[in-house]
Amino acid sequence: MGPLRLLPTAVLLLAQAAPWEASQHCGRLEYWNPDNRCCGSCLQRFGPPPCADLEFSENCGLDDAGNHVMHPFQECPPGQCNRNSAELCSLCGGGATAPIPSGSRGGTGRPCREPVPNKEPCPLTPGKSSILSSQEPSSPGIPSVSWTSEHKAPQQAWPSLSFALFLVLVLLVTSAIILLALQRHHRRLDQGKAVQHPYPSLVCSDLDTHTRFLHLSSPASLETSEARDSWKEVSLSPLLGREMPSLESQPLSRLLDELEVLEELILLLDPEPGPGGRMACGTTRHLAARYGLPAAWSTFAYSLRPSRSPLRALIEMVVAREPSASLGQLGTHLAQIGRADALQVLSKLGSSGACLA
């Protein structure tokens, strides 16, 4: 019973030690095609050796069943070289190529049955052999070099390229939606402003219109028509005419005593344009700029509302700085900022008591 127990172990050892037999049908540089039952050329299927000092393995590393049992190429034997991508190596000294065995190879041995070690710069990695085993045998007349792993690189690049294109498309669509939303929002704002002030010219009169209106009541209108752009240099008499002849000689401080007129001017000039409010051509802020006060002063004066009127503070400031300031100068500034309504209220202080039509 002892020898029988050692029989399976001996069979395994013999199977491992049994050399790989070459093709029983084809020569060394050929392989057996079991589908067509003929011998194919290793050169036509795999092409010449890709690197120097390599030659074809026996039967291209294929057995008669079409299985890849080793790599198609192997290193040259010691003392032989292959610089011209020939099928087999030759003597390094320029000798003839080693003879090529042909015909049936019934179990003949090979020069090297050990795995071929890696060699730079063209290593023969085991990963390439695993790729070879998954390929179907091709016809002898069609060369095939698809056993290299580099051919899978374009297939791996497709998913990342598709994702990048999808991301760019999403960004473009999102940007277009945002732009359309902004355009609609601006259109709605413009429509709202148009509805709120359908006739801006009626709310805020043009400066030239008031200029022509005041010039018509003056006997020297033709002479003053050439000086529309220099309001400060134009005297009060040609501008206001016979309706308010005494305003130019009255001090501005009188307005502080005429509380009724002052309150009407405050109601007209202090409010500023805003949402839902009346739009005005000129406010107390614009009037202060005509008197040469900085914008910071106007901001401070408006910050005191409603406990203190900015217009009243402006008149007190001008009277304190320039006691000789007159109502005529105030009327000129009101005409400059296009406030005919305020001019009509100011005309109540005239000796005639007439109002602008």
From Swiss-Prot:
Where found in the cell? Cell membrane
Protein topology in the membrane:
Single-pass membrane protein
Report the principal subcellular site: membrane
Region named Disordered: 100-147
Keywords tagged on the record: Cell membrane, Membrane, Receptor, Signal, Transmembrane, Transmembrane helix
The cellular component terms of Gene Ontology attached to this UniProt record, alphabetical and capped at eight, are: plasma membrane
Q: Is DNA-binding one of the keywords?
A: no
Which N-terminal stretch is annotated as signal sequence?
Answer: 1-22
Give the Extracellular compartment stretches of this protein.
Answer: 23-160
* Topological domain ranges for the Cytoplasmic compartment: 182-357
Q: Does the keyword Ion transport apply?
A: no
| InterPro entries listed in its UniProt record | DEATH-like_dom_sf (IPR011029), IGFLR1 (IPR042355)
Parts of the chain that traverse the membrane: 161-181
List, as start-end ranges, the regions of compositional bias called Low complexity. Answer: 129-139
* Function of the molecule: Probable cell membrane receptor for the IGF-like family protein IGFL.
- Return the protein name: IGF-like family receptor 1
Origin species: Bos taurus (Bovine)
